[in-house]
């Protein structure tokens, strides 16, 4: 199973590289951030194409993404977006959704702000938690807000959803990196990006063809794209069900 995930990631690197090769001839100054959550440098460099790119044209850097009052994925994402350590409420109070006619009205009623394409419907919980219990003075959504203040557009593609007892458990916490001060992201696709695959953890995986097409779709109108692969997270969560042969 791990080999299959690595193979899929290698395909993604090739696909994204093709987008760069096409686009860089015409314009500069855009960023695609690919999140390989729950993996490490050794795993990444086991992909020959990625190792080759790092050797020829890449760099390796270290960043402290420790959160405030604990260390977990959501705090790490939010700390990147805040530019400093941040604390957050439980996952059940983090609820990123793509805008619909119904939830746009609910979001505006609760925040007083105009919704964008992707919104944290429970952003007030996170704001209160970080302001009242935070120890470092970091402000949620500083990265996304800085982009917005400079007329730069962010998009988020992908999720780390899993299936538990037949029910979909949503995880779109990648948006904590990209959101503004009010939990909003300009554009993206966090809903329709996975496909069923019984050979993969939780019987779902990222649709890499869809991921490629969506990246191309949002690239022209975005300055920064945050891509959540999801499969590395799902594999790590599922590993206790596997053995050395799988």
Residues covered by each model-derived region:
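Positively charged n-region of N-terminal signal peptides that target proteins for export
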Residues: 1-5
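Hydrophobic core
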Residues: 13-18
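Active-site-proximal segments of metal-dependent phosphoesterases and phosphodiesterases across multiple
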Residues: 237-246
């Amino acid at each position: 199973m791990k080999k299959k995930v690595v193979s899929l990631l290698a395909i993604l690197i090739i696909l994204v590289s093709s987008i760069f090769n096409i686009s860089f001839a015409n314009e500069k100054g855009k960023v695609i951030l690919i999140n390989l959550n729950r993996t490490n440098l050794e795993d990444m460099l086991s992909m020959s194409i990625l190792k080759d790119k790092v050797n020829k044209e890449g760099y390796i850097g270290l960043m402290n993404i420790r959160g405030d009052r604990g260390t977990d994925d959501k705090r790490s994402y939010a700390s990147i977006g805040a530019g400093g350590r941040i604390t957050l409420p439980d996952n059940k109070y983090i609820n990123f959704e793509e805008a619909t006619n119904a939830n746009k009205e609910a979001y505006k009623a609760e925040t007083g702000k105009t919704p964008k394409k992707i919104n944290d419907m429970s952003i007030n919980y996170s704001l209160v938690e970080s302001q009242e219990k935070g120890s470092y003075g970091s402000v949620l959504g500083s990265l996304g807000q800085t982009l917005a203040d400079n007329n730069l557009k962010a998009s988020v593609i992908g999720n780390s959803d899993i299936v538990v007892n037949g029910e979909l458990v949503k995880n779109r916490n990648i948006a904590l990196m990209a959101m503004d001060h009010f939990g909003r992201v300009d554009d993206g696709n966090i809903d329709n990006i996975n496909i069923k695959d019984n050979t993969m953890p939780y019987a779902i995986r990222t649709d890499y063809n869809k991921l490629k097409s969506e990246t191309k779709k949002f690239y022209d109108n975005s300055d920064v794209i945050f891509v959540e692969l999801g499969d590395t997270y799902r594999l790590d969560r599922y590993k206790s069900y596997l053995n050395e042969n799988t």
